[in-house]
Amino acid sequence: MGSEMCIRDSNKADVVCYLPLDSRRRVKKFIQIVNPKLVLFVKYEFWPNLLNELKRKEIPTILVSGIFRKQQIFFKNYGDFTRKSLRAFHHFFVQDNNSKKLLETINFKNVSIAGDTRFDRVSMILKQDNSLDFINEFKDNKYIVIAGSTWREDEELLINYINEKATDEDKFIIVPHNIKQDSILELQNSINKKSVLFSAKSNKDLKEYQVFIIDTIGVLTKIYQAADVAYVGGGLKTGLHNILEPATFGIPIVIGNRYQKFKEATDLIDLKGCISVKNQQEFNEVLIKLKNKDSLRISSGKINKKYIQDNLGATQLIMNFIKDKI
């Protein structure tokens, strides 16, 4: 999905490409061809041979939105090789104080707490027109749950809830991670409510359907604006997807229980803007509770929106550093 986003936004770049496999020969050739003046790594992308080559060539290298945990190999007794690769970084911009302290334990002082640049990106969503006529037609001013970036394990919870607990007035939009035709048809055939696919929506009266399955990419961010509740997939097994996008719209969020590696998720769980579930029973209880308690939905949504607003500014801080130092 990251590469798809880069390609979609490729008008902002001269070239979009994959990094080579991290071998000395390949990265040496890659750097020779690209000849970068500055290199930015984001979050937790660490390629030892690439970093070592950047250091050898004395190319300014910065880590952006970095986040570190004590379980990482950098902080182990046997992590000398990986620690050595970190010396390529001229500066570390990290998300939190814990990351800064961990780097200091291995003698890196060139560290600033800047936060996560994704907050600045998602906040820009509100400045664009997010209205989609086909979504508005489908919603028809009814209560709607939007499930984004779902995997099979997420969809099992949704299917059971829709089939067994949903009233005729409830509406659902499901945006699967896997949009291969066989998977989409399997999902649709598992739902006993009236459903429609994005790819088959032409000439359909969308307000007559209860479930809308989006079998395309690139529209999820705008779709979230219509949600009363958002469920973000990946948190049960494969890795939690982006919860900042629904949060910026001020929507309560439900996720799976494997969220601990995602700072924004742990923060919003603690703040009570986000709720985690681990099984069908909890999923059912949470969705029913959110539907029945307007005050809970409103308060959770406000928490999420404020969280985005309180964490803006990382991009400008980093850009100022680049202008001043590089």
Where are these regions (language model features)?
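Short, small-residue-biased leader/transition segments that mark boundaries at the very start
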Residues: 1-7
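Short internal beta-strands
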Residues: 3, 92-95, 171-178, 254
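Nucleotide-activated donor-binding/catalytic signature segment of Leloir-type glycosyltransferases, i.e.
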Residues: 10-18, 185-214
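Active-site-proximal region of nucleotide-activated glycan assembly enzymes
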Residues: 14, 18-25, 37-120
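Short acidic alpha-helix that forms the nucleotide-activated donor recognition element
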Residues: 27-33, 203-209, 218-228, 248
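Catalytic binding pocket for nucleotide-activated donors in carbohydrate/polymer assembly enzymes
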Residues: 89, 105-106, 220-301, 305-306
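C-terminal alpha-helical cap of glycosyltransferases
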Residues: 311-326
